[in-house]
Amino acid sequence: MTREDMRLLLHIAEWTVQNHRHVRSTIRELAGTEENYLIIARELDRVNAHIVRARSLHAEATLTLVEWLVIVDSYQWKCAYCQEKPFEVMHHRIPLHEGGTTPSNCLPVCRGCCTRRKKNPPEPHGSHLNHSGSATRL
């Protein structure tokens, strides 16, 4: 790698950090409350992490933050399987490497159901997906 290439990479890295901070500060302003900011920041990080993971496996990666929030809200922020506990993880109905991170493949699930789901797959409560496979607001 040349010095010029290294300078360019450092410049891009610096730009990324600065813009990331700008995006986060804008989200904080728009959220209105610290609680709303923490929720949106957590879910943004969750979606981004799953998108990166799906891409690294060469799987489909189309889920957006808006789609994820609609899905979570359609289950009242509770586990899609037991509907008793708050959701804790983004669960893939079809294994990530096969089904990707898409609106039709992602569900909000508690850790207990996620663990049990791997052994004996239950069906989620209610169908919150339209025929095109994307989430709809209830």
Stretch-by-stretch model annotation:
Residues 1-4, 127-138:
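Short intrinsically disordered terminal tails
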Residues 1-50, 105:
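BZIP DNA-binding basic region
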Residues 37, 41, 60, 71, ...:
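Residue-level marker of regulatory loop/turn positions in helix-turn-helix DNA-binding domains and
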Residues 45, 72-76, 102-106:
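Short metal-coordination and nucleic-acid-contact micro-motifs, chiefly zinc-binding Cys/His arrays
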Residues 59-89, 110:
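Short cysteine-rich loop/turn motifs with clustered Cys
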Residues 80-108, 121:
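Histidine-centered nuclease catalytic patch
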Residues 106-131:
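Short Cys/His-centered divalent metal-binding micro-motifs
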